[in-house]
């Protein structure tokens, strides 16, 4: 049994809220492509020019080819600010009717069957291939953008799938394979721990003086120094012992800028999607794109300059109008303080952020006809057992995303050599237990496995069957929901319960709830995967508990309001009582003879009235303090 091909992808989810009603009207207007291509064309001939123009406007805003043009325009903006005249960051797919380059293509991952056609209209899948001569190739080979217009939740759920390893392994050294996996794990560890949350604020802080780059440079230097410290101590000091220092430094720098620039490119794409899908008039944006727009500047820049240009571009286009927060540079003396500053600024801005990177590893094997038993496939295959362990239980190998001590390459290599040495034997019982717990799907063409926290998948297949798309969309479905819950919990932790948002949060969470009759974006093939993910993560239970929590707080809030009204009622009664009391006293005492009103009967009445007034005061004070205590 030989390894034929290995592909490792990082899936990074996002969502965009407040999607304009125009897009859902467009979807409802033409629920399927067959309707558009056949029936709608006949209807158009009976409409007036005004009705026809309105119909075309609504129809076009969700068309796959129109979204592709919009996304390509974003990529053209990025290309105009980066790279060189001889090497763009992205591979050119073709040229459009204006002879302008097209850097993105649509991906048809699933058959467009008639039953689930209404969901296919809301699924978008695109691929951006990285230029093989670009420094971005140090980190990523291709970027896949997948998103879905969720009519029920009124959001756009999406993910970026980064193809970070794509190797033919026919003559590949196994050590080189594990080295590539180790390096990508180290990058994921850095991103998750140093750049959380992954947002524009991780790269940009506002400053009144746009020409003053001190703030930006200081912050980037913190990240860059931390990167150098981690990557040299964990990796480059061991793999580049016999190489020139200049070459090693250059490799480390290029990898840093490739990673940072890739993240920035994704964030810029999200912001452009947000601008478009939040727009009340998206048709106006499309009309502008129908004209020839040439943005090519062809700068000759190095990767560091690209990073600064992308930051400047993002700051000008996405932060300048709504960003008022400034970075308190004097307050930031360490990375922890830097991350805290980012967190506070994120609370004050509306820009979207990315989820943690999830991992999908797809391995193609040679000389395997059908998978009959998982244990039979793994028996006596120490390399395969090791790969399973690294992907499904990376913490055991010291390369987990949250590992307290991330092992260096030398330690990791020694551990792999020890495990894959047949003379040392293997803990077959322990491995089979892990295997049984991690099984997700068993098919004669492929086997799939899932980690305990649902953040990693391993796909083992015996031919070129396309399996990864199912897992990309399953992770998108799951991670979007988990990410929204995390955002709500984060706001609760930082801001407390906001009574004005109770109803909207409850409605959003209930729209995200699901059962096993859910259409799952019209992809029935991901239902089994979602069941396995939920068994590990308890996503359904988490949503239900969050809804119950908000409803409980809503009931408490209503009771608080009732108590406030009660206090006001007592205060009003007290005021009326005092007025009546003093009216009565002055009525009794206003006589010509001062002693005439002081009869036993009048004194008793005044005493009783005074006592009742005192009771009213005591009750009002007690309720006031009790209400403050309950609120606290």
UniProtKB/Swiss-Prot annotation:
Its main location: membrane. GO terms for cellular component: plasma membrane. It is a multi-pass membrane protein. It is found in: Cell membrane. It comes from Mycoplasma pneumoniae (strain ATCC 29342 / M129 / Subtype 1) (Mycoplasmoides pneumoniae). The chain crosses the membrane at residues 255-275, 506-526, 566-586, 603-623. Keywords: Cell membrane, Membrane, Transmembrane, Transmembrane helix. The keyword Transmembrane applies. This is Uncharacterized protein MG242 homolog.
